[in-house]
Every structure is written in structure tokens, then in C-alpha cells.
């Protein structure tokens, strides 16, 4: 690895997220009580039903399937150092309890060699915008791994057009139906993006629609 790339990655992985309400997307009432200054969003779509559908969707999700299925490149994936952030741990009622210690885990990779999502991981998302790709650095701030709920949330790092957090969740309800849930809070990250906020909002709406389609069986048919 070239020295300049090593320095860039080292600095990037040690960066803190650019917002204070880490873990806020875990709260089901985010739409009603968002952090001050942030715009909340929640959308969901039914993916089908049954255990096989849940496992298929959850596995794709944890392999960055929502992002890749929306045309976003997932690049510069690293484990992070844990210096700035170790993750939130939640109690049975969803209340944040303490920071989650980094634990050794077996590395798991998608078919294309991309590491599966893990807590504390950092990446740079390359988002298509016309003939260009906008770089959006992120850090995974928590992972949900339950029998009928699987997903992760990432927070923004310096250089991202937005400041905030986004949750991607696959869950199986008591009736066997499988749903994809997208929950987010965001605001423009700096003065430039505040000026072009109507454009930023339009891009967000476009990718929200793409995210909701990415795991649907019809998209891979």
C-alpha cells in the first residue's frame, strides 16, 4: 500500500462521527422525537414471508446488499481501530446501556470479497451523481443480530455530504412476514450543502426509493 494511502486510511479510521446522537436510529419513536436540527425518516417494505426469505434478505443486507443494489460502490472497507468508537450496546427494551467492547470475530466475506458488516467498521461509499461519484465516508455504529431482526446502522464521518445516522434492518414479524426497515436522521454537513439542500433532499429521496427496492425479490428476478 502506498504511503499516502496508508496515511489517509489511518487518519480516516480514527475519525469520530460528525454528530452527537449516536444510536438514535435504534429508537422506534425517532420520527416523533428527533435530535434538534435533524430531519427524521422511516420507510419500510414487505419482502415476503418465511424463514428462508428472512435469511436470504438478512445475509444480503449484511453484505452491503442495499448499497450495492442501489448502484453505490462500497470502498476502503476497514475494521477501524476502536480508538474513537466501539459501538453502542442496547438493553432488552432498546435502551442504550454502555459502549460495546470490540470482540474478536471470524471474518466473513461476500462473494465479491467485501467483508460483511461488523461493528466499528469504516468504509467510503461512492454515490453516483450524474457523471460523478460523491465520496461519503461512514462508520458502522451498531449491529443488530437477533433471531428475527438483523441489521446495522452507520454514522457519517468528516467529508460526507450529510451529518447523521442511517439504520438498515430486516425483521420477521410474528405472522412470518419479512420486512425491510430504513430509519434515518440527517442534516446537511456544512454551509455548502445547506445552500444546495434542495438538491441534497432530491438525491436522498431517490436513494431512499432505491434502498427500498434493493432487497426485494422482484429486483433479483
Which ranges hold each PLM region?
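Short, intrinsically disordered, mixed-charge
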Residues: 55-66, 145, 159, 175, ...
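Extended Gly/Ser/Thr-rich low-complexity repeat segments
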Residues: 61, 167, 197-198
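Compact beta-sheet-dominated globular domain cores
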Residues: 172-176, 181-187
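Hydrophobic ligand-binding cavity/cleft-lining segments
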Residues: 1-124
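Short, solvent-exposed aromatic-acidic interface loops
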Residues: 156-160, 183-190
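Hydrophobic-ligand binding "helix-grip"
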Residues: 126-174
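Hydrophobic residues positioned within well-ordered beta-strands of beta-sheet architectures
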Residues: 41-43, 123-125, 136, 152, ...
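A conserved amphipathic terminal alpha-helix motif
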Residues: 9, 188-221
Amino acid at each position: 500500500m502506498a504511503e499516502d494511502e496508508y496515511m489517509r486510511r489511518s487518519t480516516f479510521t480514527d475519525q469520530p462521527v460528525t454528530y452527537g446522537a449516536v444510536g438514535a436510529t435504534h429508537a422506534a419513536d425517532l420520527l416523533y422525537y428527533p435530535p434538534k436540527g435533524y430531519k427524521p425518516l422511516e420507510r419500510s417494505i414487505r419482502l415476503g414471508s418465511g424463514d428462508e426469505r428472512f435469511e436470504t434478505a438478512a445475509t444480503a443486507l449484511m453484505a452491503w446488499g442495499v448499497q450495492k443494489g442501489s448502484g453505490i460502490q462500497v470502498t476502503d472497507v476497514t475494521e477501524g481501530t476502536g480508538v474513537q468508537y466501539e459501538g453502542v450496546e442496547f438493553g432488552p427494551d432498546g435502551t442504550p446501556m454502555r459502549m460495546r467492547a470490540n470482540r474478536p470475530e471470524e471474518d466473513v466475506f461476500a462473494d465479491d470479497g467485501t467483508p460483511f458488516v461488523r461493528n466499528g467498521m469504516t468504509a467510503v461509499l461512492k454515490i453516483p451523481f450524474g457523471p460523478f461519484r460523491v465520496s461519503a465516508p461512514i462508520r458502522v455504529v451498531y449491529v443488530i443480530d437477533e433471531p428475527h431482526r438483523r441489521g446495522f446502522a452507520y454514522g457519517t464521518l468528516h467529508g460526507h455530504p450529510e451529518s447523521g445516522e442511517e439504520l438498515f434492518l430486516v425483521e420477521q414479524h410474528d405472522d412470518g412476514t419479512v420486512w425491510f426497515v430504513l430509519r434515518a436522521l440527517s442534516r446537511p454537513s456544512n454551509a455548502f450543502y445547506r445552500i444546495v439542500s434542495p438538491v441534497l433532499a432530491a438525491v436522498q429521496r431517490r436513494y431512499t426509493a432505491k434502498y427500498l427496492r434493493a432487497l426485494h425479490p422482484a429486483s433479483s428476478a
